[in-house]
């Protein structure tokens, strides 16, 4: 925005995968709360929107897919502890967007989740919560995909499928 000061909020689409999806979701909530601007859309690719990756997690995908894959529940716990400045931070919806009680006024949202990903269920639950709050939301689970599949490049069928969803979403279909 600094190099394009004439950019209008309706031209902004936030996009992020994994922790980047966390940042995009948190920024959308913060933008609404501050009233400074609101992006038109957000695209969250296998987003990390929660703060609990223990065995007690509300989301079964943490237990089902939290071992023996690239992203494990143990790594997620480590990342959470590195990211949080304090235990209190972990309770903030700017840290874990799914904790936000009021999800009204959020941008149009596309959420893509991976079938074999500890983050799958929280991403899908976040989409349901956004929809229940009256937002326009699409959620698609990429079958047989692992967390991080976007790094495989455009030759990957999972990436191609994702780009189809993204293009349709951006075109407003």
Question: Where does each model-flagged region fall?
Answer:
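Alpha/beta-hydrolase superfamily serine-hydrolase fold, recognizing
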Residues: 1-173
